[in-house]
């Protein structure tokens, strides 16, 4: 199930995700001790571009948080969750963490699959093994990840397609 936490109301109803309050989202997230972490941003530079969404969850449930629309109090709830003793998993989390640091959020327990992949292939020629999430999904799971939607968030906002991609 995909949950979207946003104060920007959708014009059209969809069966692809559920619009949820922060309280409902936290009821899904709080039981998790191991949680996936990802974000979507306006660009690559955390000092000049904005954090747009934070995605948290597991295989069964994904929560997409519209960072641009939630209240200061809701941001504090997300901060407290991310700074808890949970283990957060992701790919290339160094990128996501820089945007979180600018927001004053400092997760304590991080497991970055890209760093693990780099350590596994340390010393091998770089051309031997690409380190992207797309490459890892193909190498380990034989799954092709379509990243073309990622560029649409800046111009189109949180469309149904973008929410589903972010939760992916």
Predicted segments, located by residue:
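A short acidic-Thr-Gly-centered motif at the start of a beta-strand
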Residues: 20-33, 78-82
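Short alpha-helical segments and helix-capping/turn motifs at coil-helix boundaries
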Residues: 22-23, 37-40, 73-77
């Amino acid at each position: 199930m995909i949950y979207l936490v946003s104060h920007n109301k959708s014009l059209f109803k969809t069966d692809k995700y559920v619009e949820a309050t922060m309280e409902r989202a936290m009821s899904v997230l709080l039981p998790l001790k191991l949680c996936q972490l990802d974000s979507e941003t306006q660009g690559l530079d955390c000092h000049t571009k904005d954090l747009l969404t934070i995605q948290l969850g597991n295989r069964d449930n994904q929560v997409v948080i519209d960072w641009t629309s939630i209240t200061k109090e809701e941001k504090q709830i997300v901060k407290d969750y991310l700074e808890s003793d949970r283990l957060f998993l992701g790919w290339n989390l160094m990128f996501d963490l820089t945007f979180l640091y600018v927001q004053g959020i400092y997760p304590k327990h991080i497991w970055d699959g890209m760093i693990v992949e780099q350590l596994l292939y340390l010393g091998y020629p770089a051309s031997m093994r690409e380190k992207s999430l797309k490459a890892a999904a193909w190498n380990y799971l034989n799954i092709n990840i379509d990243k073309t939607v990622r560029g649409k968030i800046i111009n189109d906002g949180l469309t149904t397609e973008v929410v589903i991609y972010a939760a992916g």
